[in-house]
């Protein structure tokens, strides 16, 4: 990615009414200038003229029962593949078979990452969301000694216009894990414990070959 240009395209379909809301089909595609696009992801964006109140939420005390002993710098050096700008996990508060709790930094402004951004501020915070998926990778590594990549999300709902600038606490509640798949939900809250957003029905694929792709030095162990 550092030496080759990659073209990313965003597509939006026709507006459709669904009850009291409107929906738009969206796609993220990548490819070359030849027009041979690859569809990376699809979703339905639900449009509304108002925010809905955040639901009440309190995670189980069992979620914070297990300590996480690895150093964050070591985590990024030894397990995760993310570069410096995406290293947003500040502290992993706890990790157990039930899930993980972590403090996550907010992303810098769009102009720090995009040469000509469409907005001056983020709506959904890209660094926070990516770090949530990083948490899932680390949790899978603790439980199954292998890593994962996201494959599906049922829904994402945000309860305010933007994420707090001072970061959030993210709770990953794992609902299922096998040798090949994990499922769970994410809850994002501010420093006062108020819910900022929820991501429901997260699914990831586990595969030992991914660790070799993340960290080439592990290829010798194949």
What kind of region is each of these model predictions?
Residues 1-222:
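Acyl-thioester-processing domains in fatty-acid/polyketide/NRPS systems
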């Amino acid at each position: 990615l550092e030496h080759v240009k990659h073209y990313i395209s965003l597509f939006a379909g026709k507006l459709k009414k669904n009850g009291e809301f409107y929906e738009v089909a969206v796609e993220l595609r990548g490819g070359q200038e030849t027009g041979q696009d690859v569809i990376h992801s699809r979703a339905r964006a639900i449009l509304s003229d108002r925010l809905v109140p955040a639901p009440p939420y309190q995670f189980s005390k069992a979620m914070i029962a297990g300590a996480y002993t690895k150093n964050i710098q070591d985590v990024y050096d030894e397990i995760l593949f993310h570069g410096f700008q995406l290293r947003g996990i500040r502290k992993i508060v706890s990790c157990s078979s039930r899930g993980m709790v972590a403090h996550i930094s907010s992303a810098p402004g769009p102009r720090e990452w995009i040469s000509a951004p469409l907005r001056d501020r983020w709506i959904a915070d890209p660094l926070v969301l990516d770090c949530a998926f990083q948490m899932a990778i680390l949790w899978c590594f603790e439980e199954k000694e292998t890593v994962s990549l996201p494959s599906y999300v049922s829904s994402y709902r945000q309860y305010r216009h933007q994420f707090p600038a001072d970061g959030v606490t993210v709770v990953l509640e794992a609902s299922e894990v096998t040798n090949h798949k994990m499922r769970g939900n994410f809850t994002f809250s501010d420093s006062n414990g108020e819910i900022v957003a929820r991501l429901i029905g997260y699914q990831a694929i586990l595969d030992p070959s991914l660790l070799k792709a993340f960290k080439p030095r592990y290829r010798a162990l194949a």
